[in-house]
């Protein structure tokens, strides 16, 4: 109840790959002067930072659900756009993505759209059947 954060765990064979999925914000220019105390001699006249409005994501990713409650296939179903965002941030095309609690198979649908290989695990036979038919349709 009243939870703002839900954990997303990312595992890989080697050091994590991360390609930031930047969000849109207000463009800005910022001027700053380096500190002489820290032995920063270059740019004493000031450095101008020009940003077109892109921002790194915060800890809250806002993806509205795209279904009515009565159409929900699984109690913890996530939006496909959220799965796509995460998959694009942490994998490349043809990489293998595994979801060990696949539920309604949102991750599988996103992988199919993004050209990733996919391994899904679900212990509940009913949810497994629903998820397989969902990704095959």
Protein language model features and the residues they cover:
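Core catalytic lobe of class I
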Residues: 1-130
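Short, conserved SAM-binding/catalytic segment
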Residues: 132-137
């Amino acid at each position: 109840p009243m939870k703002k954060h839900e954990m997303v765990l990312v595992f890989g064979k080697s050091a994590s790959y991360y390609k930031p999925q930047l969000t849109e914000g207000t463009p800005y220019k910022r001027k700053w002067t380096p500190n002489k105390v820290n032995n920063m001699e270059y740019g004493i006249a000031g450095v101008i930072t020009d940003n077109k409005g892109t921002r790194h994501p915060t800890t809250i990713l806002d993806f509205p659900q795209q279904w009515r409650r009565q159409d929900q296939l699984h109690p913890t179903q996530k939006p496909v756009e959220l799965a796509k965002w995460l998959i694009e941030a942490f994998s490349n095309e043809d990489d293998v993505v595994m979801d060990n609690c696949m539920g309604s198979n949102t991750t599988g649908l996103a992988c199919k759209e993004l050209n990733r290989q996919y391994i899904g695990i679900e212990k509940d036979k009913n949810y497994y059947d629903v998820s397989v038919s969902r990704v095959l349709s």
